[in-house]
Design a protein with these regions (language model features):
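Short coil/turn segments at secondary-structure boundaries
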Residues: 71-79, 92-93, 108-115, 128-131
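Histidine-centered, transition-metal-coordinating active-site segments
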Residues: 1-81, 85-91, 98-99, 134-372
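Aspartate-rich (DDxxD/NDxxD/DxxxD) Mg2+/diphosphate-binding motifs
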Residues: 102-129, 137
Length: 372
């Protein structure tokens, strides 16, 4: 039965996917051998394992950029992840890539983020600077390979080599000998487009920037031109919503037009052949230039906003304080992290414990063990 179903999956993918896509039948498999299932392919299983993991559920309690003190409209790591998955699957379907693999990669890409976003990551990197530092991308691999437990005979989620390798490209940003799979590139492009749009949206809603400031940016002007060509008149709220929607749409359109043309010219006959090229899925031309301008604006006017900086500095101080307490008093941690410390060293285990916390649970632990 399992063999027949996998044959069906292979036949379906052969009819739908492009030759340059990663076909499920070509997977390098998992670290630990498992019996194949009759109703799911390997990347479908990866997706489901990620979604059902504790680390994935905790993303709902981790801030993206803005904290819960600023309201409850803005994105969390989980909503960001869902938005990335949505855009990445759109790219995959249009480009005839493996949508199951793309979805698994997208749902997995931010699973290693600690509490309080990049402020938390910077704080843990400081705490662990003599131990090799801290990277949320590397921690995602630690979660998948060590910390999550789903089987009595082996550690981790036992994801496919393709998902693990895709995440590994986020750890080491240096130019690889061979390019990442096109599915990995699609997720990277979707991630970038998504946070540009939703950070702009959240910053507007929270009053950190004014719409008049955004109107000075080239990418917003392009969006305005596109809206004017198809809509006569909109109210203020509807117009701003249309801008955010078009901000995504114009980037997705740019990526698909450029990539579709390039893929037709390359005529790769396999995923391996595509990896021999230095081609990258992403925005190009006027849109790419305008995108960089928007990102520079967000960096200066939003990410370095006094309210955001104040929150970052507080979070970093508190994480460093709790880290110091836990290193001196490891018995505070759950026993499995004490045992984990015997394998990776106590400081690293403390870092892993804190990195797995939601914002709220961190605050509870801080109040209980530091601010008492």
């Amino acid at each position: 039965m399992a063999h027949n179903n996998l044959q069906t999956i292979a036949e379906r993918e052969a009819s739908i996917l492009a030759p340059y896509a990663m076909h499920s039948s070509d997977t390098l498999g998992r670290c630990y051998d498992e019996q194949q299932q009759s109703y799911r392919g390997p990347f479908q299983r990866d997706r489901d394992r990620i979604v059902h993991s504790a680390a994935y559920r905790r993303l709902s309690g981790k801030m993206q950029v803005f904290t819960g003190d600023m309201g409850d409209y803005h994105r969390t790591r989980l909503t960001h992840t869902h938005e990335v998955s949505s855009i990445a699957r759109t790219l995959a379907r249009a480009l005839r890539l493996n949508e199951d693999l793309v979805e698994a990669l997208a749902l997995f890409h931010d699973i290693g983020h600690p509490p309080f976003g990049h402020a938390g990551e910077d704080a843990l990197a400081k705490c662990l600077e003599t131990e090799g530092g801290f990277s949320h991308n590397q921690y995602a691999l630690t979660i998948a390979e060590q910390l999550e437990t789903r089987h009595q005979h082996f550690p981790g989620l036992n994801l496919t080599q393709e998902v693990l390798a895709g995440q590994a490209t986020r750890v080491d940003k240096s130019a690889p000998e061979i390019s990442p799979l096109l599915e990995v590139q699609a997720v990277e492009a979707a991630d970038s487009m998504t946070y540009d749009a939703h950070d702009t949206d959240d910053a507007l809603k929270l009053g950190l920037v004014k719409f008049a400031e955004l109107e000075q940016l080239d990418l917003i002007k392009i969006c305005q031109q596109q809206i004017a060509s198809r809509v006569d008149e909109l109210g203020e709220r509807e117009y701003q919503r249309a801008i955010i929607h078009t901000l995504l749409d114009c980037q997705v359109t740019n990526v698909l037009e450029h990539t579709s043309t390039a893929l037709a010219n390359f005529q790769w006959d396999s995923a391996s052949a595509a990896r021999q090229s230095d081609f990258r899925i992403g925005t190009v031309g006027e849109i790419a230039k305008a995108k960089k301008q928007l990102e520079a604006f967000l960096y200066e006017r939003v990410y370095r906003h006094v309210a955001i900086v104040k929150t970052r500095e507080l979070a970093q101080r508190q994480i460093q304080q709790l880290f110091a307490v836990l290193v001196k008093n490891p018995e505070i941690m759950p026993i499995r992290f004490v045992e984990h410390g015997e394998q990776v060293g106590l400081p690293r285990s403390v870092g892993h414990y804190i990195a797995g916390m939601t914002d709220r649970f961190f605050e509870q632990q801080f109040l209980a063990h530091v601010s008492r």
